[in-house]
């Protein structure tokens, strides 16, 4: 998305292409097109992309679809990213969380903190409008992309998540 794209662009500018390892995660809870667009963006920046997958619907804590399911989903994500970080001997995991995200209910922040993930855009006190402007200045094709959300967010809490229900919510 816009936020992660700016994080990646700035990381490449500061650290160089050989010192960043962008990871694009294919998730059952997001549209496939989001995965492929993210890969395209990374490649357009001239850096090697690492593709991986998550199987959220195999985790009962996520499938239960409670407000805390977001924590378990992020914990699964950050756990996978932490394994990759260790494999490649990198120091940090960076995400695209922004100041606007602090205004919402975000149980995933607990998982972020547990894994020591850096939200560098929040650390810089940047909001969505500023991120879009930075993205536009750097000619990133995602500068005006609409915010994406998990398909599970369209399903009421308490309704058990399944692949068929996720596909219905995608329509």
Residue map of PLM features:
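ATP-dependent adenylation/nucleotidyltransferase module used to activate substrates
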Residues: 1-137
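Histidine/lysine/aspartate-rich catalytic loop segments that bind and position anionic ligands
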Residues: 136-156
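C-terminal scaffold of the Radical SAM
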Residues: 155-163
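Residue-level detector of conserved catalytic or cofactor/ligand-binding positions
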Residues: 164-171
């Amino acid at each position: 998305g816009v936020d992660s794209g700016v994080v990646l662009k700035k990381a490449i500018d500061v650290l160089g292409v050989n010192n960043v390892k962008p990871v694009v995660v294919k998730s059952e809870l997001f549209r496939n097109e989001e995965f492929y667009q993210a890969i395209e963006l990374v490649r357009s920046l001239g850096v090697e992309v690492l593709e991986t997958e998550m199987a959220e619907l195999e985790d009962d804590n996520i499938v239960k679809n409670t407000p805390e399911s977001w924590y378990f989903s992020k914990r699964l994500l950050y756990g996978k990213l932490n394994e990759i970080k260790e494999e490649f001997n990198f120091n940090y995991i960076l995400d695209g969380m922004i100041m606007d995200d602090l205004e919402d209910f975000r149980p995933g922040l607990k998982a972020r903190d547990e894994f020591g993930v850096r939200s560098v855009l929040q650390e810089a006190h940047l909001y969505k409008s500023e991120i879009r402007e930075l993205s536009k200045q750097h000619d990133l094709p995602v500068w005006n992309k609409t915010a994406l959300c998990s398909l599970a967010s369209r399903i009421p809490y308490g309704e058990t998540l399944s692949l068929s229900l996720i596909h219905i919510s995608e329509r």
